[in-house]
Amino acid sequence: MPVDVPPADELDPPGDPESVARTICLRLLESQARTRAELEAALRKKGVPDDAGQRVLDRFTEVGLIDDGALADGYAQAQQGRGLARRAVAQKLRRRGVDEATIGHAVSTIDRSSEYAAAQRLVARKLPSLRGLDPPVQARRLVGMLCRRGYSTGLAHDVVRTAIAGVDLLTDGD
């Protein structure tokens, strides 16, 4: 995920690397929560010495301005609410530089039943737009949609099979 960093001439004072690091981090944290890895990358990109950057990041972690665990937990819940499966959430957190233990804890807060229910909601929302297609085509498209959102193939087939069977039962009575 690219991180916007303010131009170097806006940073003051130019001679103190810790002050520059602090300014960069605070400006980035103003707009949204960031992982420690994202902030490290931004500092590296701006040429802040590693030791000065690490001291600032350590201090920000101490005071709670950087909390990868809280960010990962909130991100996992928000993304799951948008219909992403645990696997996709974990992949996005990895890309943001969150460590595996923290990712494991964050995705463990998403239980299987809520993941299944989210998949059902996605399928129910998409199914009406596929109404005129043959059931195998509907199934293929719905399974593909779920797999792209990180759901396992088995869960996707199960949810789609149930949804298409439910639609068939409703239309048989017409």
Mark where each language-model region is.
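An alpha-helical, amphipathic repeat domain used for nucleic-acid recognition
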Residues: 1-174
